[in-house]
Curated annotation (Swiss-Prot):
Source organism of the structure: Listeria welshimeri serovar 6b (strain ATCC 35897 / DSM 20650 / CCUG 15529 / CIP 8149 / NCTC 11857 / SLCC 5334 / V8)
Keyword Ribosomal protein (UniProt): yes
Annotated gene: rplJ
The protein's role, per its UniProt record: Forms part of the ribosomal stalk, playing a central role in the interaction of the ribosome with GTP-bound translation factors.
Protein name (record): Large ribosomal subunit protein uL10
Subunit structure: Part of the ribosomal stalk of the 50S ribosomal subunit. The N-terminus interacts with L11 and the large rRNA to form the base of the stalk. The C-terminus forms an elongated spine to which L12 dimers bind in a sequential fashion forming a multimeric L10(L12)X complex.
A GO molecular-function descriptor: structural constituent of ribosome
Length: 166
């Protein structure tokens, strides 16, 4: 087998593995961004633990078909880059959406969220959600509210009794 064919097959395997292992994958069109802007975007994504890579569309298409993600083929035209996140589902969508607001040249096309193909609208909706840590802190606040209310009521009763004794 030729070295070129082996390299292409290993690239398809790499994409397949990353697609199946990632919690969130977002495909973007980076046409129109200059080198400085792409470097800035890569740094933001890297700091969040997200891999951002450019693959040939034909190789990506083969990996997408092998993983059974129907509906992504339409997004695989033109110059594309793919952001893979193995841990945080929201982070790639949030970072790319925020970057796209400041840089109109970046266009979010589609993605895969926890094994399901997601449209542009779904990715933008995901980007507006708070991060996992933010959601957990909201949940803690909701769970603490009744306990806090009980503690305040108990303290008020104790203060009232002290006031009556004095």
């Amino acid at each position: 087998m030729s070295k070129v064919l082996e390299a292409k097959q290993s690239a398809v395997e790499e994409i397949k593995t990353k697609l199946s292992a990632s919690a969130s994958t977002v495909i973007v069109d980076y046409r129109g961004l200059n080198v400085g802007e792409i470097t800035e975007l890569r740094k933001q994504l890297r700091d969040a633990g997200i891999e951002f890579k450019v693959y040939k569309n034909s190789l990506t298409r083969r990996a997408v078909e092998a993983n059974g993600y129907e509906g992504l083929e339409g997004a695989l035209t033109g110059p594309n880059a793919i952001a893979f996140s193995n841990e945080d589902v929201v982070a790639p969508a949030k970072i790319l959406n925020d970057f796209a607001k400041d840089h109109e040249a970046l266009e979010i096309k589609a993605g895969v969220i926890e094994g399901k193909v997601a449209s542009l609208e779904e990715i933008k909706a995901l980007a507006t959600l708070p991060s996992r840590e933010g959601l957990l802190s909201m949940l803690c606040n909701v769970l603490q509210a009744p306990v806090r209310g009980l503690a305040i009521a108990t303290k008020a009763v104790a203060d009232q009794k002290e006031g009556q004794e004095a």
